[in-house]
Amino acid sequence: MAVSSALCIFSLLVLAQAQSELQQPKIELRLAGDKRKHYEGRLEVFYNNEWGTVCDDDFSIEAAHVACRQLGFLGAVAWSPSAKFGQGEGRIWLDNVHCTGRENSLAACPSNGFGVSDCRHSEDVGVICNQKRIPGHRFINIMNNNVETLEERVEEIRIRPISSHLKRIPITEGYVEVKERGKWRQICDEEWTPLNSRVACGMYGFPGEKNYNNKVYRSLSMRKKKNYWGFSVNCTGNEAHVSSCRLGKALEPKRNGTCGRGLPVVVSCVPGRAFAPSSSIGFRKAYRPEQPLVRLRGGANVGEGRVEVLKNGVWGTVCDDNWNLKAATVVCRELGFGSAKEALTGAKLGQGMGPVHMNEVECSGFEKSLTDCYFNNDALGCSHEEDAAVRCNVPAMGFQKRIRLSGGRNPFEGRVEVLAEKNGSLVWGTVCSENWGIIEAMVVCRQLGLGFASHAFQETWYWAGDANADNVVMSGVRCSGTEMSLPQCLHHGKHINCPKGGGRFAAGVSCSDTAPDLVLNAQLVEQTTYLEDRPMYALQCALEENCLSSTARKNDHSSYRRLLRFSSQIHNVGQSDFRPKLGYHAWTWHECHRHYHSMEVFTHYDLLSLNGTKVAEGHKASFCLEDTHCDEGISKRYHCANFGEQGITVGCWDTYRHDIDCQWIDVTDVKPGDYIFQVVINPNYDVAESDYTNNVMKCKCRYDGYRIWTYSCHIGGSRSSDMDEYSGMSNQLNHLR
């Protein structure tokens, strides 16, 4: 009886807490004020469509903890009374706030009530938060706008091409129409401006607009009945979408359907270079950024990624303080896309590396480049956990209509089936799986808009695809990884060659919203490199696992091998955990070292001549993938002890110390000279990652026959001079598959 009473009381308490959370007002918080860091400032509350402040009466460190956690930080370091960060304006929303520190929102703490205060703004409270942010916390800027926009009046907006342009891809020109109460209506162009056209083109993925042949549209409008929408549109030109523009004056269309002296609105957009058709080569085979100073990394789809800028020859990231759609749109247009769909914060698309070049970016939306915007050079306090990212509007190319996944358990997996021309008609068929790998699978998932590839399958007998699509219609597929669609990859064309045929051997994929991203700590490699002369009798296990040069097999046990040793620290800065490709059942047992290898080749270690030829090499099998250490606030998930689960958690790193077997390159046979020391992680693409360009690390080194000097170590793609060098490395790795 006592137990049931206790359970009843506990249930009532849980129910009361849930009801309390549902009843508490929804508020948003922000930090404001001058001369402050991004993690500190005057505490402001957004309530009842108005920003206001918090009085310092009875405020405490517990209340500061609640506020900082609500803002996405791990907690508070301190709080400050008496408007230390300047006096705010408007309402003082909260006074006499009493928190225990366990509340999920400042609104859950007892207070005088919203707007009930006897304070002045000279008593505005400020907080100083822990600089570390809660992993995965999404930051949303709340903006107040009392102006009625199109979003409140229309259901949809489109660009409708004239009949002679219907087959053009992409559609760059046509009538701008809005859907209201289920009917499409044209817009009168009397109040239409080039700024409106700029916004309309941007939302459809185009960076600019141009003039069009007015005579053609005037002639067409004279022959067709018009159905005008009853409002004009007023855009400033920096909106990300026409629906964000203000409604202009109401129009009074005449009975004959005209709008005074005007005509239906027409826009003609200029596509970015990657989407512009060419009579000689068709669409560009792969997306390449048009500007050298800004790039996107870590995104699954074309037009999205972490924003990186080039400064003094080194690529770095942008801190997300004040990051918004205007700044994101400048980036998107600069790279040949349209306006921004999203301005992402909190390293939503993975963490970068190297310096943080820009902070507190403020753009008007009309700048030609992000580097033209105002920004703070001082990124003190910013970390890669705050890397800004974008998702851009891109033109509709129709790629998704020509590919599908069939037979999978969910929409993210299945046999790959493509639409191909055969005997003058379009038919669905399969893709030959010979040499099919994760790079090709990445292109498929991108074409379908399903994110990253998690696996590539060369057998799909367990997925019952469309029986009418069993025939192979594409073979010899080899992708570089940057293509927007599978037909843009190299393939055999009409001359199909697939010895195994389709059916059970058709290519398949599984896709995922997220992917890991491994990056080596180049500085640690540079700091820990040294030479060791080690006797052969202590290297028998290493010899068995092919960690020594082939000449070592000719040596007796009393001879020595010269080893270039170093430590490696491999960070997962992606969006999901890095796991071995194979499960327990497929791991390989190595008797000499008495451990399993979850990946036979996890890293390649190479010493190269200055022209790129290998002069010595090594490799490291993943006998143990685990979370050696993690960032603050992240718990270890993978441990090798007792044959535990293997992997590297997001925000953690695995360390291979210099003093363990095979953590070296055998340089016994190397002559004195200048060389390139190279490490490649996941060289065979056994596990999917969001970015492979940063899997390569290179150092310069000089060997005099006795000593070795290692310097200038850096990750692939981290410097402007790496672009050609590392794209070449990517091609070399492709040939290994």
Curated annotation (Swiss-Prot):
GO CC annotations on file: basement membrane; chromatin; collagen-containing extracellular matrix; endoplasmic reticulum; extracellular space; membrane; nucleus
PROSITE patterns, per database record: LYSYL_OXIDASE, SRCR_1, SRCR_2
Protein location: Secreted, Extracellular space, Extracellular matrix, Basement membrane; Nucleus; Chromosome; Endoplasmic reticulum
Signal peptide range: 1-18
Reactions performed catalytically: L-lysyl-[protein] + O2 + H2O = (S)-2-amino-6-oxohexanoyl-[protein] + H2O2 + NH4(+)
Known EC number: 1.4.3.13
Residues bearing carbohydrate: 256, 423, 611
Keyword field contains Endoplasmic reticulum: yes
Keyword Metal-binding in record: yes
Binding positions (Ca(2+)): 517-518, 689, 691, 694-695
Disulfide bonds: 55-119, 68-129, 99-109, 188-259, 201-269, 235-245, 319-382, 332-392, 363-373, 432-498, 445-511, 479-489, 541-592, 547-662, 624-640, 630-652, 699-713
Keywords: Basement membrane, Calcium, Chromatin regulator, Chromosome, Copper, Disulfide bond, Endoplasmic reticulum, Extracellular matrix, Glycoprotein, LTQ, Metal-binding, Nucleus, Oxidoreductase, Repeat, Repressor, Secreted, Signal, TPQ, Transcription, Transcription regulation
Gene3D superfamilies reported for this sequence: SRCR-like domain
Region (Lysyl-oxidase like): 516-718
Lysine tyrosylquinone (Lys-Tyr) crosslink residues: 620-656
Entries under Pfam families matching the protein: Lysyl_oxidase, SRCR
All residue ranges annotated as the SRCR domain in the record: 29-130, 159-270, 294-393, 403-512
Name this polypeptide is given: Lysyl oxidase homolog 2A
